[in-house]
Amino acid sequence: MSLAASALSALYARPAPQAPPHASHLRRNVMATLGLALVFGAAARVIELRPLELLHDAGNIGVFLRGYLHPSFAHLSEYAWQCVITVCIALWGTLLGAGIAVPLGLLGARNLAPHPVVYFAARRLMDLLRAVNEFVFALMFVTAVGLGPFAGMLALGIHTGGVLGKLLSETIESIDPGQVEGVAAVGAGRLHVISFGVVPQVMPNFLSYILLRFESDIRSASVIGMVGGGGIGFYLWDTIRAFNDREAATVILLIVLMVMAVDVVSSRIRRLAI
């Protein structure tokens, strides 16, 4: 074969030119943006999103809010005591949830589950506990144990157990396996491996999750009384339903102050303990 023929063959054998990497990356970003825009556009149509009506009805909103500008403090002590009950509901609900989360988190972690069936069952149970809202659990427990804070605490605890269990299992799955293998290498049993190889690695994050969930449970406990779960939520629903704007304003103000105080305290505890 001649030199010219070889050069011609090599020329045609070259691969087709490809688009620069940045061009394909830009194209993917544009397509992803258009896809998200279509999804949000369809969702806006489903929920009948009409933001201009807020401006059109701004006068009615102002009339509604003016009724809340002059809170009444005639029943302040009663409402304050209900806030204390609400904090206690959240406190024990979070504690119950943490207790439920520990076995579920251990069994629902892929690297600790004793069998795939156990792993699957623990995961699905956590999904169930997270999927059912606290209000639904509260309605169930009100039927079972009657009206009051105990039903609210059980509802919060069951739901919180699913949330914390999911977070704990994912934390366990991301731990350093070297420390676990080191404990197992000296002949330690499964309980000792968990105690000395797993717990020290996950405890700081788990405590942080518990404190964050306690803040969330405070907010949930503030309204769970609407369905008979005890606490300040019942008075919030009662005053709003009766169009007693001044009393409702007092209840809302106390709830806001309670949530702010709990957030500040839990943030300080988290910085000191973790």
Model-identified regions with their sequence ranges:
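N-terminal, non-cleaved signal-anchor transmembrane helix
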Residues: 1-95, 102, 107, 111, ...
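Alpha-helical membrane-protein architecture signal
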Residues: 76, 80, 84, 114-121, ...
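Alpha-helical membrane-interface segments at transmembrane helix boundaries
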Residues: 80-88, 122-129, 133, 211, ...
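Cytoplasmic-entry segments and transmembrane alpha-helices of multi-pass inner-membrane transporters
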Residues: 104-138, 167-170
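Generic hydrophobic transmembrane alpha-helix motif, especially the helices
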Residues: 126-157
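Glycine-rich helix-loop "coupling/hinge" segments at transmembrane-helix boundaries
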Residues: 143, 218-255, 274
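Membrane-cytosol interface at the C-terminal ends of specific transmembrane alpha-helices
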Residues: 147-213, 264
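C-terminal transmembrane helix and the adjacent membrane-cytosol boundary/short C-terminal tail
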Residues: 208-211, 249-274
